[in-house]
Amino acid sequence: MNLGIINAMGNTPTVFIHGSPSYYAKLEGFNPFGSIKDRAAAYVLQKGYEEEVITPKTNIIESSSGNFAIALAAVCQIYRNVFTCVVDKNLLPINKKILECYNAKIVIADKADENGSYLKNRLDIVKDLIDKIDNSYWVNQY
């Protein structure tokens, strides 16, 4: 399997910022899939394969709707794993399109809790999917 693009992660440019104090800033947006989350997604899959808890037949599941979801979808595509992404109705249309481009299966949580948050419902859906889908792996960023 050619993981060349994964090996490119983290090799992002730095720029010098003049000021008091002066400092260098690393431009993580130059990672292949657009954010620092690329590294975490690649690490999860690499480590899972090394420890043999993930195989090519494993369905990767996570509750995320932003940069981590996009990075996981892309990395799963490289490894040829199915990626199921649990999101809520606040998913940005552009992120939905990107996830679809990486063939992510999208499950939408539509019930908010008493505080208006969807996180509990999203996590309940993830747990249900883990129970129902054989050979699945929950990344569990929380």
Residues of each region from the PLM?
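PLP-dependent amino-acid enzyme catalytic core
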Residues: 1-142
